[in-house]
A protein has these predicted regions:
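Aspartate-rich (DDxxD/NDxxD/DxxxD) Mg2+/diphosphate-binding motifs
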Residues: 1-20
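Histidine-centered, transition-metal-coordinating active-site segments
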Residues: 17, 21, 26-34, 38-230
């Protein structure tokens, strides 16, 4: 359930929840029946630092900046992908209208999906080359526009009334499933990593669900079955 699911798990788990940290946990502690994958530092660093929420996208002084150019490319690609797809999804869903998008952003980034992506990607290439490829960069003009577009999405899409309604539904589904699993961990929770409390391993189980699986399990566990008509 996207950000809503992440927020809900963050409230349920004693140490909170962030999808990037959970991704690292999966490859280090959960894969291969708890043995983990033998990944290099560079790959693990890129996984853990690929996401930045509302923080700096490519601040060279930021403590959470990926250590490698490849990791920095993943980080900026993540932003380019989700701001473009989310703005289009919000338009198609009727959450916002084209005229709601600030004219200044349209002027800098373009009106159409392909135009925006092309402009952002080419700017990253040109700014990074201009800096001698010491780090992945964006020009100040495009960076300001991307940050403004991201903030527009937070204010008008992610935190709008429809999103809050979906959050309440998500909290209900995930919260009920989490409580159900905690009552019978032997049925759902894996026995590894050894030493991790059941509540953390229950979080692993919930976090590993797809939306469809979670809704199907919720229906099977909590909703009554229809009676056949004789």
């Amino acid at each position: 359930f996207g950000h809503a699911g992440e927020q809900t798990l963050g409230k349920l788990l004693p140490l909170g929840f962030h999808h990037a940290d959970q991704s690292l946990r999966v490859v280090e502690k959960l894969e291969y029946d708890g043995k983990g994958l033998n990944l290099t530092f560079e790959v693990r660093d890129g996984i853990q630092r690929h996401s930045k929420g509302r923080g700096d996208i490519l601040d060279e002084d930021a403590e959470d900046m990926p250590a490698t150019l490849e990791g920095q490319i993943v980080r900026v690609s993540d932003v380019i992908a989700y701001v473009n797809h989310d703005i289009d999804d919000a338009l198609r869903a009727g959450i916002i209208r084209e005229e709601d998008v600030p004219a200044g952003l349209v002027k800098v980034l373009g009106k159409w999906h392909a135009t925006r992506i092309d402009r952002m990607v080419m700017d990253v290439v040109e700014a990074s080359l201009a800096g001698g490829l010491e780090r992945i960069a964006m020009s100040d003009r495009i960076m300001r526009a991307v940050v403004e577009l991201r903030e527009f999405l937070y204010q008008n899409v992610y935190f709008n009334s429809a999103a809050r309604d979906e959050l309440r539904k998500t909290e209900k589904i995930i919260g009920d499933l989490f409580a159900y699993v905690m009552e019978r961990p032997e049925e759902y929770v894996k026995p590894y990593p050894a030493g991790d409390p059941a509540v953390v391993r229950a979080g692993d189980f919930i976090a590993g669900m797809t939306d469809r699986y979670a809704m199907a399990l919720y229906e099977r566990v909590f909703l009554p079955k229809s009676w056949p008509i004789l």
